[in-house]
Amino acid sequence: MENKWTDRTALLLGEDKMSRLSNAHVLVVGVGGVGAYAAELLCRAGVGELTIIDADTVNTTNINRQLPATHSTVGRLKTEVLAERLRDINPEIRLHELPMYVEAPLLSPQGGKLQSEQEDENEFSRDVITPSALLDKLSNVPEMSSPHGGNVGGRLFIVDAIDTIAPKCALLGEALRRGIPIVSSMGAGAKSDITQIRFADLWDTYHCGLAKAVRTRLKKEGLRRSLPVVFSTEQADRRAVITVEGEQNKKSTAGTISYMPAVFGCYLAEYVIRKL
């Protein structure tokens, strides 16, 4: 009998679990340091359908920690590089690559969406998309839609690996409002102690500036709901953080080490596999 590449996983998890993984659809938003590792581990575990979204290209400064980043891939889309790896691992995977940025919706002074945003938000041809438009689009594609109808609250699971506050909170808020399962990564930068990485509810996190900012934003939106996250209890090394100018949604850059984002990605993948 010919060996299957999933045999060792099936030996551990059992055929029923493997069937659930094969029929699952996971959306990974952000495939840099954390998200790319999560996506690859989900693929290797046998998740049958993945959507990866990120408009970034590989930069030399990514090489120290990001799975898609090598000297030969500098300048290429991270989604493109990662997709090649995922298809080489599982040639039968149902894989959707979206080289786009997820952005918070534009608001008018009265608090509603701007007209241009209302008209264009469902177009995948743009390089920017709101979480609402993204999830609406996924729910309207037959092979991605929920078996229960309506939005994609059935078999879809979301992995949030966005590292900027506004789009991150927009995605989290949309998922929470729709009741779509989601797990989120908090900050791994300026930290190096692998033993302090934890799972927790967002509202129980500490020593994490990103988590604090996310809590504040969601609370203002009336979304004080349970949200599983991976974070580190280690206090950030302030000496490893520098201010930057001219970068969208970014005021600072933190020093990083190779293994921290990878382990955050491991935690996210394990959570999804356990919950599916």
Set out the residue ranges of the language-model regions:
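N-terminal charged helix/coil linker that caps or initiates catalytic domains
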Residues: M1-V26, T60
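Glycine-rich phosphate/adenylate-binding loop
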Residues: E2, G153-G154, T164-P167, I182, ...
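Hydrophobic/small residue at the entry helix of a nucleotide-binding pocket
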Residues: V34
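Conserved S-adenosyl-L-methionine
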Residues: R44-E49
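Glycine-rich phosphate-binding loop and adjoining beta1-alpha1-beta2 segment
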Residues: D54-I89
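Conserved SAM/SAH-binding loop
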Residues: P99-L106
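Short amphipathic alpha-helix with an adjacent loop that forms part of the alpha/beta core around
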Residues: L106-L107, T130-L138
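Glycine-biased, low-complexity coil/linker segments
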Residues: G111-G112, G149-G150
